[in-house]
Amino acid sequence: MNFEIKDTNIRKIFDSRGNFSAEVTVILENASGTASAPAGASTGKTEVIAYPDNNIDNGIDFFYRHVKKALKGFNSINQEGLDRMLHEIDGTDNFSNLGGNIATAISIANAKAVSNALGIPMYRYVGGINYSMPRPIGNVIGGGKHSKNGTTIQEFLVSAQGKTVLDSIYYNILIHRRIGEILSGMFKNQSIGLGDEKAWTCDISDEDAIEIIKNASKDISSEYKIKVLNGVDFAADSFYDGNYYIYKNRKLTRDQQIDYAISISRDHGFYYIEDPLNDQDFDGFSEITSKVGDKSLIVGDDLYTTNPERIKKGIEKRSTNGVLIKVNQIGTLSDTARSVRIATEHGLKTVVSHRSGETTDDFIAHLAVAFGSPLIKTGTIGGERLAKLNELIRIEEELI
């Protein structure tokens, strides 16, 4: 079987916010693969550069001048070699010439092309025999950089633990609906809206949101006799001014923010706590994990940015017991797989995640299964979110 790359095409498409995204098609002799990259609103300082000078056209121009010809004839089954070549052609340590989003689209499209050529699903090609089904965790109340006039905390999340992925998705949707009913009752003469990730957003406090999500989860849990895990993504770096954590109605010192994050676990029983501190405070994360890591999953996103070296630092300091995984934070499938391998070898749980500006590409569903991640973070409703969730349903059907 011939795995040489015959051609590679790139085009501009639109993401869920109406912004441009890069989509790439890798063409082999008897198969092809197409992938597109999402975009984040709350981005970590150590992520690779999405597009050079924040301009997708500059990245596309670099692709045509330097990458397209180099890919032709390359053995596509050598994923690590292809990803290494992308780094070499770019010539920087953060993809500032090609753009990490374009590198991501090329890397994933290549893996899809090989999977299609072999006649196997992508999760099996990437994960081999080591795969398992994750449970979805989705945003139901949103704030921060995902909405205007919402909560300071960026995401309030639920993960219903149904017998199947289908059940879990359905129960998450029911909780989302229940929260909409609660908010409609609270704001009878005001409209409520949906944020970037289709979570409810309105002018409420973080404390109100905590109580609403607890009540909605309890309602669905009691009615359907299921367990529901609640969570938050603080995205704390986005409201940290260098000295204080600035909420709508107060500002907290570092120690007060640590205590608040701990109370989310101890006092409210939340299982999932992401980015409770700024993205340089490895020691502060360690303090939170040492106090409540036995009952809650403390997850680093901006702290790690899917970067193997930062994950190693977190392991050394025992900063978290969970790592968020986003391919376009690091730029290639091989780099992502390395980060996952380092994390899992040291007992950290991985959570494969979408971005707020998503496309309908479903590749993260396959990666979550391939990496054996216990959770996949990809919303509850919205076409670009359900594209991933529906693909999980199809994958589970294959595996049952």
Curated annotation (Swiss-Prot):
Keywords noted in UniProt: Cytoplasm, Glycolysis, Lyase, Magnesium, Metal-binding, Secreted
InterPro entries referenced in this protein's UniProt entry, alphabetically: Enolase, Enolase-like_C_sf, Enolase-like_N, Enolase_C, Enolase_CS, Enolase_N
PANTHER family: ENOLASE
Protein name per UniProt: Enolase
GO biological process: glycolytic process
Localization, UniProt: Cytoplasm; Secreted; Cell surface
Keyword Cell membrane: no
GO molecular function per UniProt: magnesium ion binding; phosphopyruvate hydratase activity
Record-listed E.C. numbers: 4.2.1.11
Cofactor notes: Binds a second Mg(2+) ion via substrate during catalysis.
Gene this chain is encoded by: eno
Cofactor: Mg(2+)
Reaction catalyzed: (2R)-2-phosphoglycerate = phosphoenolpyruvate + H2O
